[in-house]
UniProtKB/Swiss-Prot annotation:
The lineage of its organism: Bacteria, Pseudomonadati, Pseudomonadota, Gammaproteobacteria, Legionellales. Mn(2+) 1 binds at D11, D346, H347. Its EC number is 5.4.2.7. Mn(2+) 2 binds at D305, H310, H358. It comes from Legionella pneumophila (strain Lens). Its main location: cytoplasm. GO terms for biological process: 2-deoxyribose 1-phosphate catabolic process; 5-phosphoribose 1-diphosphate biosynthetic process; metabolic compound salvage; nucleotide metabolic process. This is Phosphopentomutase. The keyword Signal does not apply. One of its GO terms (molecular function) is phosphopentomutase activity. Isomerase that catalyzes the conversion of deoxy-ribose 1-phosphate (dRib-1-P) and ribose 1-phosphate (Rib-1-P) to deoxy-ribose 5-phosphate (dRib-5-P) and ribose 5-phosphate (Rib-5-P), respectively. Binds 2 manganese ions. It catalyses: 2-deoxy-alpha-D-ribose 1-phosphate = 2-deoxy-D-ribose 5-phosphate; alpha-D-ribose 1-phosphate = D-ribose 5-phosphate.
Length: 407
């Protein structure tokens, strides 16, 4: 075994529209560049938090802006003013058909999603009548609220009071392959919410739905707030992923945040939950202090997507990026001689775009560590190149089927 791997997934941090973006209604999307330009125009100031241009010195030093320029061709920054990147840098193109969390993560771990997910139409009462009636029956519910495409925070404010009064959970979806259930932790019960999500998971399988998501909230009308007790019930990957092969090989696979949920808890040896990007970074640092040789520490930083991308909060996204960037030196000092850190994303979610959905984009691929020299790895034709490179570095005995190593 040689060294350890740490993967940091900046959920939704795309760096330029993919060639097929127009098929998804996402032509021109660019999460990073549009945030960068909004900051440059002075549109992302937050009193007491951030002001002026986007400042990401650590990510820039690892090649983020070089990768973004290669991805989109947009001259948003003068590369001549930047130092030569200190690690591997490039961008990757998604082969999976979706632009969702499971597709991006599974492909990254060696399993592109080549089948079509099921989706619910964007219309009132969007769920099949058979599905809802069976859900109500099996869960012994008085009914449901919502039944439409919606932003989770908006529908929570819209229907939260009625939910508490009637005991009916709020069910909704989006452009992703999801069946989401929101309920008040005290009035409805957190465990009860989890229980009905498990029932829903079985019911939506026939519709090829990727995830059932529990969306608990607390508070009173006018001040409802989501809690950190979200739980994703994902359909399992169709093939063994990098995580499965590592676990079978006797390695430690430490899943932080929602990683275990994304892989349906397969291939994971340890699960660590944390709420919020900074708590997730703290958990990552703690794991890296004790992770043995040959192990994988895998963290998803969900706030970029759920708190800022979907909510089209450009300033909040910029601030979150700067907070993340500032923590990277804390991770670097914990690295052992043969360790590698991979920074990537799973899709885009351009906060300057209309609507509230993900955007079809390239993702950054940045790799650094004590023994990693500067190298432009160019365009990677599949997210699975990340998994294949990790498999090579960790000397995994079972090679992945997809992807080409760039090490």
């Amino acid at each position: 075994m040689t060294g350890r791997i740490c993967i940091l997934v900046m959920d939704s941090f795309g760096i330029g529209a993919s060639l097929d973006a127009a098929r998804y209604g996402d032509a021109g999307a660019n999460t990073l560049v549009h945030i960068y330009e909004a900051c440059k125009r002075g549109e992302c100031d937050i009193e007491g938090a951030r002001k002026g241009p986007l400042m990401l010195p650590n990510l820039a030093g690892k090649g983020l802006y070089h990768a973004a320029m290669a991805s989109s061709g947009l001259p948003f920054i003068d590369l001549a003013t930047l130092a030569i990147p200190s690690g591997y840098y490039g961008y990757a193109v998604e082969q999976s058909l979706g632009k969702d969390t499971p597709s991006g993560h599974w492909e990254m771990a060696g399993v592109p999603v080549t089948f079509e997910w099921g989706y619910f139409p964007d219309k009132p009462y969007c769920f099949p009548e058979e599905l809802i009636s069976e859900f109500i029956k099996q869960c012994n519910l008085p009914g449901v609220l919502g039944e439409k495409h919606a932003s989770g925070t908006i529908i929570m404010d819209e229907l939260g009071e009625e939910h508490i009064r009637t005991g009916k959970p709020i069910v909704y979806t989006s452009a992703d392959s999801v069946f989401q259930i929101a309920a008040h932790e005290e009035a409805f019960g957190l465990q009860r919410l989890y229980d009905i999500c498990k029932i829903a998971r079985n019911l939506v399988d026939k519709y090829q739905i990727g995830r059932v998501i529990a969306r608990p909230f607390t508070g009173k009308p006018g001040s409802f707030k989501r809690t950190g007790n979200r739980k994703d019930y994902a359909t399992p990957p169709p093939e063994k992923t990098l995580l499965d092969f590592l676990k079978e090989d006797g390695r430690e696979v430490i899943a932080i945040g929602k990683i275990a949920d994304i892989y349906a808890h397969q291939g994971v040896t340890q699960e660590i939950k944390a709420d919020g990007n900074m708590a997730l970074f703290d958990a990552t640092l703690s794991a890296m202090k004790t992770a043995p040789q040959g192990s994988l520490v895998f963290t998803n930083f969900v706030d970029f997507d759920s708190s800022y991308g979907h909510r089209r909060d450009i300033a909040g996204y910029a601030h979150a990026l700067e907070q993340f960037d500032a923590r990277l030196p804390e991770l670097e000092v914990l690295l052992q001689p043969n360790d590698m850190v991979f920074i990537a994303a799973d899709h885009g979610c351009d906060p300057t775009f209309p609507g509230s959905d993900h955007t079809r984009e390239h993702i950054p691929v940045l790799v650094f560590g004590p023994q990693v020299n500067s190298k432009f790895i160019g365009r990677r034709d599949c997210f699975a190149d990340i998994g294949q490179s990790i498999a090579e570095h960790l000397q995994l005995s079972s090679p992945l089927t997809h992807g080409v190593s760039f090490l």
